[in-house]
Amino acid sequence: MTENGFRVEADLLGKRSIPDDAYYGVHTLRAKENFDISGRTIASLPYLVMALAAVKEAAADANCELGLLPRPYRDAIAAACVEIREGRLHDQFVVDVIQGGAGTSTNMNANEVICNRALELMGHARGQYEYLHPNEHVNLAQSTNDVYPTAIRVATCFALEHLLEAMARLRDAFAERADAFAGLLKLGRTQLQDAVPMTLGQEFSTYAVMLTEDIARLQEAGWLIREINLGATAIGTGITAHPQYAEKALAALRRITGLDLSTAPNLIEATQDCGAFVQVSGVLKRIAVKLSKICNDLRLLSSGPRAGFGEINLPPVQAGSSIMPGKVNPVIPEVVNQVAFEVFGNDLTVTFAAEAGQLQLNAFEPVIASALFRSFSHLTAACTTLAQRCVSGITANPERLRETMERSVALATALNPYIGYKRATAVAAEAHATGKSIREVVLERQWMTDAQVDEALRPEALIRPRVL
């Protein structure tokens, strides 16, 4: 019954007025009022909203196949879920991402939105739950405790694939620059001190390899997250569900999502354990560590332009100072550094929340989901931004690379096989003290011939193993 643009819905706490145009109901309204915490609603996590709809559609399919849900109910529920999976009605998911209750508010938000849209499709008004009910039908044979973690895992799979794509593009950008810089000899450094020669191409190919390795680690974590507890219901015993429900719901969810999901071998363990989230978050932290290290290098190698390393140029994307004319800052690597710092904190949040579970349930999966999806989203954006607005436009300064190479006393290392470590040390010390080149000092001491020095300092001999 509606009046003045509102309908009345009731729960165990009493009656409340719900806006007529709202697809959510009384449970969602109370949760919206209770959890004004982060300013981020479930709608800000589109993968989670789509995953919730996929789980509800799979449940309806399974229950219908088992004869527990009439076909017209199943069809209306499934149609509503398809609309949500296609991006509609996301604005109706209004509960804060961070909430008490182990995700019950999120589950009920989904139940009510799906139910009210299904009612419309059946020719009824929103809130006419005598024809289709959020709990009795949309949530049939389900608990928040299997729906919510399953939805998080499915959403994580979606987010993971997009991050993998962004990482692959960044890896390819570094590999392309490595090819372009393959012939540019430069000085390597350890502990910020002159070390031995390498090519700029080798330096950039290292970044591509780092990303390749982390892509593999993320793919491995993705297999772990594909194990779900749908059918566990409240604590893993499967109470209120048909004996074949878990199997049929899994098959439906695999079909709907296209994911290679599996049911956990022990549903009681799977319902209370958050180890898979810890594992995935740890891999995200590893990726963030690598990205931040790479960006530290890019900032250092491009420092200057006249009083720093100045070996590479980052593409200028904006003016760098409100007071210093002409200054350009490495803003893209800097923003990636900051994303990494955020991911480190998110990983700690996941760790604490996973540890805080008690007995048969972890009540803190909402903050785990919040932290995980923020890390996924920001890392994906960071990889894309770094590839498109920085790495693809990096250029080298060959003259600067040559200058630092020729002036470095570290070239004395290449003399070890010819004159031994002791004499090579003496050559390096004299070159450093006098400003002479390594070539000049070793020839003056007559410890090597011109031909031997040429061979020792030949670029190809400086950057890879060889037999003398």
Across the structure, where does each feature detected by a protein language model lie?
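Conserved, well-structured ligand/cofactor-binding cores
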Residues: 1-468
